């Protein structure tokens, strides 16, 4: 009996030690690469990311430079692979899972950093499973971001078309100019500050939408299910048609020159000037505040 108990104890101890080693990253080694590509040879960048963070930065160089730094769990498999497919650059990050413990992330696994000249490529598309993203002063015709879990911070983006789809994570866009912007969020708050866009549409299932230092534009549409909506204009609009409705919460519209046509418990509509531009705000169970 004592021998059996000792054997069981030894097996449990080995299992605990093995788990601890996995958690602490024992068995993995550091991974770091750097590659550069001449501007003009690459028209589009596609990133398929499993679990690393991603950073985009502007550069004055005439080259696109990609650096990676993180953990390599399998010596035979690089966690990040970069290849060219015609005029498209494809970056794939995948961490080989050695066991059950590797299905869980403990701390930061790694970072992919892309330095790109302004207007260096025509499109960047990111398919992100898990990881945070940061964009700094990128100028590009088209951006398409899809993320399952992770926060996204965008600063100083200049683009003709911007599309952001997020399942779970906060989104912040600051000091950017995006002619046509579409944001679709399931869970997570959306914060847009000093964003210029002639056509903006933001939808959120469970999360607030805040548009600060807003500028009057042709069309701004915001729909939420469970989440408050707040729009604060930098300068008073001159020609704006306003429609706001909420099924279960308060609606406040405080704009200079706003003439109400409907002032009901669940909706407010009205116009400023000729109403050439549109502001449409709809929430099923959130407050609406416009000022």
Model regions: which residues?
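Exposed beta-strand and adjacent loop surfaces of beta-rich binding modules
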Residues: 44, 63-65, 79, 121-123, ...
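Solvent-exposed coil/turn segments that connect beta secondary-structure elements
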Residues: 59-61, 69-72, 85-87, 94-96, ...
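Generic detector of contiguous secondary-structure segments
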Residues: 3, 49, 71-84, 228-246
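Short, surface-exposed interaction patches in beta-rich subdomains
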Residues: 173-176, 180-182, 191-291
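N-terminal glycine-rich phosphate/adenylate-binding segment common to multiple enzyme folds
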Residues: 186
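Right-handed parallel beta-helix
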Residues: 32-40, 80-165, 170-179, 189-191, ...
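Active-site alpha-helical segments that house and flank conserved acidic catalytic motifs
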Residues: 45-48, 126, 145, 244
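Short acidic/polar N-terminal linker immediately downstream of export determinants
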Residues: 2-10, 14-77, 98-119, 259-275
């Amino acid at each position: 009996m004592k021998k059996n108990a000792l054997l069981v104890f030894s097996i449990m101890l080995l299992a605990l030690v093995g788990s601890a080693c996995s958690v602490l990253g024992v068995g993995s080694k550091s991974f770091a690469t750097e590659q550069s590509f001449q501007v003009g040879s690459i028209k589009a960048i596609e990133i398929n990311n499993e679990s690393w963070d991603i950073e985009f930065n502007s550069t004055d160089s005439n080259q696109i430079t990609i650096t990676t730094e993180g953990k390599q769990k399998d010596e035979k498999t690089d966690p990040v692979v970069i290849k060219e497919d015609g005029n498209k650059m494809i970056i794939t990050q995948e961490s080989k899972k050695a066991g059950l413990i590797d299905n869980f992330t403990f701390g930061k696994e790694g970072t992919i950093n892309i330095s790109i000249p302004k207007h260096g490529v025509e499109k960047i598309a990111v398919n992100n499973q898990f990881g945070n993203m940061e964009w700094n002063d990128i100028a590009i015709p088209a951006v398409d971001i899809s993320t399952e879990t992770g926060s996204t911070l965008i600063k100083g983006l200049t683009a003709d078309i911007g599309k952001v789809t997020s399942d779970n994570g906060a989104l912040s866009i600051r000091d950017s100019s995006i002619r046509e912007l579409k944001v679709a969020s399931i869970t997570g708050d959306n914060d847009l500050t000093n964003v210029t866009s002639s056509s903006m549409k933001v939808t959120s299932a469970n999360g607030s939408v805040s548009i600060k230092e807003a500028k009057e534009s042709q069309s701004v549409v915001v729909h939420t299910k469970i989440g408050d909506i707040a729009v604060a204009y930098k300068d008073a609009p001159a020609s704006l048609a306003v429609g706001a409705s909420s099924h279960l919460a308060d609606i406040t519209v405080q704009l200079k020159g706003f003439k109400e046509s409907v002032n009901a418990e669940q909706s407010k509509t009205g116009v400023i000037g000729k109403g050439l531009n549109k502001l449409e705000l709809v929430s099923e169970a959130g407050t609406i505040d416009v000022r």
